[in-house]
């Protein structure tokens, strides 16, 4: 950095030294200016002009600037790109400054602490922290924009993996960690260096800014008292954190960081919850992605083709966020689930009441985020007025809720405060249409403060008073063109043309000479100017005080306001579920302890909606039955495009919806609670981390086999296709046997390996199903019905024909297939039909040439093999073939 020489640049350098890792927005008059490297970065990122100071002196200082009234938009862009921004404001009136205007950093904004109005309404903006103590790794996350605060911790060798899984699900914007704590295996750009450039990390599609802090910030002796003091308690036992030192330390580190970067009371952060993943239906990042819960797998399908978009008809921003939260963490508590279902059922049968309730919530803005700006002291007059308007709708919401007497609605009705006292105070304090800022006054309603009214009267009557002086001076001087004007440099002055300046009285004091006129003042005019300007300054001062008192009063009631926002969010989601159930013919799922999972005429909640998919085809519903004994694994065969993947996904989506507490798209649903949903659907190379398609497939499959329980639901689609036919078939075979014998989880296994269908004859819990196809005139019609039994062929060539492969290729493929089918029939002609297992026309890998290997396999107890042992056996068998 060049040595600053002017007093202004010395002041800038002193502030910058305190915030070396932030872009410094330095207030100069009506602009925020940035200098040196900050200016170069900001000009590039914001696409604004880069200029320089002191060019002529040979000591050029790069600089750029943005208007102060538009700064929030520019700052938001930088925050979204991972930068930190320190805002340095003028904290005294430039007119009153004796020398250099005093400036201070009034706020520091980071990706994880921003609470600005441009945040997406449906998602949280989490700041996370990771703390490690011995065998424990603690994790905490705070959404400063809403006040949501949570913490957990894990123990053992897989603790860091589970924390990473939590991060991938939660997707925070910023992570705090001890400077000596190694973080996760992540892709980090080369620009992740010291200075203002953000330190960004990307892990499996999720990106966040990384902020290292000194290790002492995470020390329990320092961090835990911060949490206790914030909540005003002697012990964290009431929050479930009494013996969770790592989790509490992570939470304390967050509070430390927020206190350093923000001002305000943080009254809206009024609670913290300890949670454990096993207390909800666990959906890891792979499952969330594969089921397209929040984001589509392929962007060209449009942002609407997700479960969230399909289920989101909420009326409020808080409802959207709660819907998303319930979707990512469905309940496993049947009492909680049924309480929600009871509330929904009562609304489904009362159409008028349901719609009245939804209309009452329509137009309610983001109470949680408006409140956060109040407590952080960044709320402007329009924010407070917006809050009051939201509060004004609450009596209608409470009145509409009285029609519904389910237990959960009665609780929510009691939690929902109409906040009439705060509403009335805001309305009686602020004008109907206040300006955004307090800089020019005009915010406080007339009649509220006598001193303010008196000053306003003086200021507002200035035009009339000046007109009277002007008319009097015209008569006294005989100058008909004499005018009294005002500007910010000279204040009030009398302007006389050159032709009449000789008529100016002796008591006129010359202020400025122009080409065509002279400007004068008088003692009377100077005295009045001082009164008017002083009045305007005092008006702004009084209005700031009154507004500050109002904002403080609301912040003091943050607990009431936030509780109302949370209750309103739940009312909104439950009314939303009732609306969907009534308009889409959903049914109420019934939960029991039988271990069964039975769906009658179930539908895919997204694909059945033509407004999202753009398809005019009628969706074909299907049944599904799984249990803990005779139907634990379904082997699903059939052609591509037949609907296998849709069938798998809709089973999982129904489970997720049901445990969110929603009605589901089916004629009937009888379910047992699921503890985890696993998916292995599709494949994608991760070459950046040296992982091939097959390695990704095997890693995900291994995680499923190692962690699934007998209460899990597993979806496996084409396991083994990422390698050779023989290897893939062997792995798929071993996986089914392992699922059947070891995990006893409910599993749907879609495959093109028709050889796997013989397992249904050997394993009591395995059942064959297929997606049906109709052949007509050499063409195939996909009926998309799932029926018992194995498919008789794959129809791969027919699908290739539909895809438009050249006729020559199709004909050659038919000839090759016919030749291989002939070889297969000859190879198995000595076997009985029972020994062959079926009349399948698929190629078999068990020919006379490999009879020795077949015998070896028959002698092997596959039920006692682990997946790794199965792979080793496969390797040995392949060596024999070679």
UniProtKB/Swiss-Prot annotation:
Keywords: ATP-binding, DNA damage, DNA repair, DNA-binding, Nucleotide-binding. ATP binds at residues 638-645. InterPro entries: DNA_mismatch_repair_MutS, DNA_mismatch_repair_MutS-lik_N, DNA_mismatch_repair_MutS/MSH, DNA_mismatch_repair_MutS_C, DNA_mismatch_repair_MutS_clamp, DNA_mismatch_repair_MutS_core, DNA_mismatch_repair_MutS_N, DNA_mismatch_repair_MutS_sf. SUPFAM superfamilies: DNA repair protein MutS, domain I (SSF55271), DNA repair protein MutS, domain II (SSF53150), DNA repair protein MutS, domain III (SSF48334), P-loop containing nucleoside triphosphate hydrolases (SSF52540). One of its GO terms (biological process) is mismatch repair. Gene3D superfamilies: 1.10.1420.10, DNA repair protein MutS, domain I, MutS, connector domain, P-loop containing nucleotide triphosphate hydrolases. One of its GO terms (cellular component) is cytosol. One of its GO terms (molecular function) is ATP-dependent DNA damage sensor activity. PANTHER family: DNA MISMATCH REPAIR PROTEIN MSH1, MITOCHONDRIAL (PTHR11361:SF34), DNA MISMATCH REPAIR PROTEIN MUTS FAMILY MEMBER (PTHR11361). This protein is involved in the repair of mismatches in DNA. It is possible that it carries out the mismatch recognition step. This protein has a weak ATPase activity. Belongs to the DNA mismatch repair MutS family. This is DNA mismatch repair protein MutS. It comes from Koribacter versatilis (strain Ellin345). The gene is mutS.
């Amino acid at each position: 950095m060049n040595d600053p020489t002017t007093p202004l640049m010395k002041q800038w350098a002193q502030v910058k030294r305190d915030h070396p890792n932030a872009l410094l927005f330095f207030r100069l008059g009506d602009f925020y200016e940035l200098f040196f490297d900050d200016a170069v970065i900001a000009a590039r990122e914001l696409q604004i002009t880069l200029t320089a100071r002191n060019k002529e002196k040979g000591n050029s200082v790069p600089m750029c600037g943005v208007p102060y009234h538009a700064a929030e938009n520019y700052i938001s862009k930088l925050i979204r790109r991972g930068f930190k921004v320190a805002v340095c404001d003028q904290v005294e009136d430039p007119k009153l400054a004796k020398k250099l205007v005093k400036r201070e950093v009034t706020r520091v904004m980071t990706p994880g602490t921003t609470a600005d109005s441009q945040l997406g309404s449906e998602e949280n903006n989490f700041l996370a922290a990771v703390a490690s103590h011995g065998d424990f790794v603690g994790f905490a996350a705070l959404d400063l924009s809403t006040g949501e605060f949570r913490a957990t911790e894990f123990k053992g060798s897989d603790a860091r993996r589970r924390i990473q899984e939590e991060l991938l699900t939660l997707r925070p914007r910023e992570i705090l960690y001890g400077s000596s704590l190694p973080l996760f295996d992540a892709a980090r750009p080369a620009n992740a260096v010291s200075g203002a450039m953000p330190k960004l990390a990307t892990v499996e599609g999720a990106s966040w800014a990384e902020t290292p802090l000194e290790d002492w910030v995470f020390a329990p002796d320092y961090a835990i008292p911060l949490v206790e003091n914030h909540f005003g308690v002697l012990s964290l036992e009431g929050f479930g954190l009494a013996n969770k030192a790592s989790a509490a330390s992570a939470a304390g580190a967050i509070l430390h960081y927020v206190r350093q970067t923000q001002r305000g009371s943080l009254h809206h952060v009024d609670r913290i919850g300890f949670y454990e993943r096993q207390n909800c239906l666990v959906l890891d990042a792979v499952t969330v992605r594969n089921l397209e819960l929040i984001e589509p797998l392929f962007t060209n399908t449009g942002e609407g083709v997700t479960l969230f978009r399909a289920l989101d008809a909420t009326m409020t921003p808080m409802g959207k966020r709660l819907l998303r939260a319930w979707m990512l963490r469905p309940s496993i508590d049947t009492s909680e689930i049924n309480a929600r279902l009871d509330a929904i059922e009562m609304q489904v049968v009362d159409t008028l009441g349901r719609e009245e309730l939804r209309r009452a919530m329509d137009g309610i803005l983001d109470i949680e985020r408006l409140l956060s700006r109040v407590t952080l002291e960044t709320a402007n007059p329009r924010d407070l007025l917006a809050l009051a308007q939201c509060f004004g709708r609450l009596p209608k919401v409470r009145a509409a809720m009285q029609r519904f007497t389910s237990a959960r609605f009665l609780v929510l009705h009691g939690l929902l405060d109409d906040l009439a006292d705060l509403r009335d105070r805001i309305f009686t304090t602020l004008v109907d249409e206040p300006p955004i800022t307090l800089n020019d006054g005009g915010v406080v309603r007339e009649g509220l403060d006598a001193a303010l009214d008196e000053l306003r009267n003086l200021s507002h009557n200035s035009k009339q008073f000046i007109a009277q002086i002007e008319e009097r001076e015209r008569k006294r001087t005989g100058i008909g063109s004499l005018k009294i004007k005002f500007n910010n440099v000279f204040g009030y002055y009398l302007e006389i043309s050159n032709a009449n300046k000789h008529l100016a009285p002796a008591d006129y004091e010359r202020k400025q000479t122009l080409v065509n006129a002279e400007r004068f003042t008088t003692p009377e005019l100077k005295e009045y100017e001082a009164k008017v300007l002083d009045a305007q300054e005092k008006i702004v001062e009084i209005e700031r005080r009154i507004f500050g008192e109002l904002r403080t009063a609301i912040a003091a009631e943050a607990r009431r306001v936030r509780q109302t926002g949370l209750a309103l969010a739940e009312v909104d989601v439950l009314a939303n579920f009732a609306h969907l159930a009534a308009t889409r013919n959903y049914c109420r799922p019934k939960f029991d302890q039988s271990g069964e999972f039975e769906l009658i005429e179930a539908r895919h909640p997204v694909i059945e909606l033509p407004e999202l998919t753009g398809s005019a085809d009628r969706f074909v519903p299907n049944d599904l039955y799984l249990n803990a004994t005779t139907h634990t694994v379904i082997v699903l065969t059939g052609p591509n495009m037949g609907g296998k993947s849709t069938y798998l996904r809709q089973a999982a989506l129904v489970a997720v919806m049901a445990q969110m507490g929603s009605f589901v798209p089916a004629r009937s649903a009888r379910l047992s609670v699921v503890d985890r949903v696993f998916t292995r659907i599709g494949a994608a190379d991760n070459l950046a981390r040296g992982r091939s398609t097959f390695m990704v497939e095997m890693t995900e499959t291994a995680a499923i086999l190692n962690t699934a329980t007998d209460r899990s639901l597993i979806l496996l689609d084409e396991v083994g296709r990422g390698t050779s036919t023989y290897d893939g078939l062997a792995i798929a075979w071993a996986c089914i046997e392992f699922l059947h014998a070891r995990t006893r989880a409910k599993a749907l296994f879609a495959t093109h390996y028709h050889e796997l269908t013989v397992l249904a004859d050997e394993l009591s819990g395995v059942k064959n199903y297929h997606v049906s196809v109709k052949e007509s005139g050499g063409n195939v019609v996909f009926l998309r019905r799932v029926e018992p039994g194995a498919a008789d062929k794959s129809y791969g060539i027919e699908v290739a024909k539909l895809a438009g492969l050249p006729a020559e290729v199709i004909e050659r493929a038919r000839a090759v297939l016919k030749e291989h089918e002939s070889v297969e029939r000859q190879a198995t002609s000595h076997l009985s039909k029972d020994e062959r297992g079926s009349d399948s026309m698929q190629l078999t890998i068990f020919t006379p040439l490999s009879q020795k290997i077949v015998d070896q396999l028959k002698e092997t107890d596959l039920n006692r093999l682990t997946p790794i042992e199965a792979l080793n056996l496969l390797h040995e068998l392949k060596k024999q073939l070679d």
